[in-house]
Amino acid sequence: MGIKHYKPTSPGIRQMTRHTFEELTSTRPEKSLLERLTRKAGRNVYGRITVRHRGGGHKRMYRIIDFKRNEFDGIPAKVVSIEYDPNRTCRIAKVVYANGAKRYILHPVGLNVGDTVVSGPDADIKVGNALPLENIPVGTIVHNIELYPGRGGQLVRSAGASAQIMAKEGRYALLRLPSGEQRKVLLACRATVGQVGNLEHENIVIGKAGRKRHLGFRPAVRGVVMNPVDHPHGGGEGRSPIGMPSPVTPWGKPTLGYKTRKPNKKSDRLIVSRRKK
C-alpha cells in the first residue's frame, strides 16, 4: 500500500493525495455478500436531521462483514482476495471456509492471499485468527473486540487501529484502546489478533471540497454566519462576535471542552483511566 502524489496542476490537486490500491487483488465483490444500502442523509424515521453534514455521495452496496467470527469454529478458512469497501476506512478480506462458506472479514496488517485463518477457543495466536480474550496472552495486539459475548466486534475496527491486552483479572481483561483509554472487557468476549490494515489512511489529504461531497459529506457552516433563528452565535451587523462568554452548540449547550458524558453511566465502572486529552 502506498500514497500517490500529484503535480500541482490546479489548486484542488496541489495538496491532494490518494491511495495507490496496490494491495487490492479483486475489483468485483462477492454478490452473495452484498446488500442494498439505502441512503438516510442523516435523517431518522420521522425525516428529521439527527446527524448534520450528511447527504449525497456515490451510490454504494453494503458488504456483509462477519464481525462475530463464531459460526465455523475450528474450520480453517483460506484468504482468496483483498478488496475495497466504500463503507469503511480499512480493506476487507474474502475468506472461503473448508466447508465452502464465504465470508468477509476486516483485513489486518500482514494477512495475505493464500493465508489461512481460524476462529474458536483453540485457534493459534496468529494474525487474523479470532478467539476469546481469555485465550490470548497479555501484551498481544488485537482488533475487532466484542463488548458483549456473541454480539460481534464493536471496538477497534477502523484503518490502522489496534488495542493491547494489558492485564487479566477475575472475569475481565484490561485493554488499552487507540484513544489511550484503559477499559475492562469480559474475558469471554472475542477479539481478532493483529492490527487493522490500511495504515496509510491517516496520511490521505482530501484536497478539495468535491472529493468530500463524493464521500457523502455536506458542508459545515459556522454558527456566527447564520441568522439568530438558526444558531445562538447568529445575527449582528456585518462581522460580529458571538456575543456570549463561551461558544455553544446550535442547541445552546457549552462546547469546546464541556463534558457531555452522563455522570452515572453504567460502563464507568469498567473504565480504569479515561482517554488522553
UniProtKB/Swiss-Prot annotation:
What InterPro entries does this protein's entry cite? Answer: NA-bd_OB-fold, Rib_uL2_dom2, Ribosomal_uL2, Ribosomal_uL2_bac/org-type, Ribosomal_uL2_C, Ribosomal_uL2_CS, Ribosomal_uL2_dom3, Ribosomal_uL2_RNA-bd_dom
The record's region (Disordered) falls at 226-277
For this record, the Gene Ontology CC terms, alphabetical, are: large ribosomal subunit
Say which domain of life the source belongs to.
Bacteria
GO biological process terms, alphabetically, are:
cytoplasmic translation
Disulfide bonds listed in the record: none
SUBUNIT field: Part of the 50S ribosomal subunit. Forms a bridge to the 30S subunit in the 70S ribosome.
Instruction: Return the similarity comment.
Output: Belongs to the universal ribosomal protein uL2 family.
Q: Which UniProt keywords apply?
A: Ribonucleoprotein, Ribosomal protein, RNA-binding, rRNA-binding
Give the GO molecular function terms: rRNA binding; structural constituent of ribosome; transferase activity
Name this protein carries in UniProt? Large ribosomal subunit protein uL2
Native source organism of the sequence:
Symbiobacterium thermophilum (strain DSM 24528 / JCM 14929 / IAM 14863 / T)
Checking SMART domains in the record gives: Ribosomal_L2, Ribosomal_L2_C
Task performed by this protein: One of the primary rRNA binding proteins. Required for association of the 30S and 50S subunits to form the 70S ribosome, for tRNA binding and peptide bond formation. It has been suggested to have peptidyltransferase activity; this is somewhat controversial. Makes several contacts with the 16S rRNA in the 70S ribosome.
PROSITE patterns attached to this UniProt entry: RIBOSOMAL_L2 (PS00467)
Classification via Pfam families? Ribosomal_L2 (PF00181), Ribosomal_L2_C (PF03947)
- Which PANTHER family did the record assign? LARGE RIBOSOMAL SUBUNIT PROTEIN UL2M, RIBOSOMAL PROTEIN L2
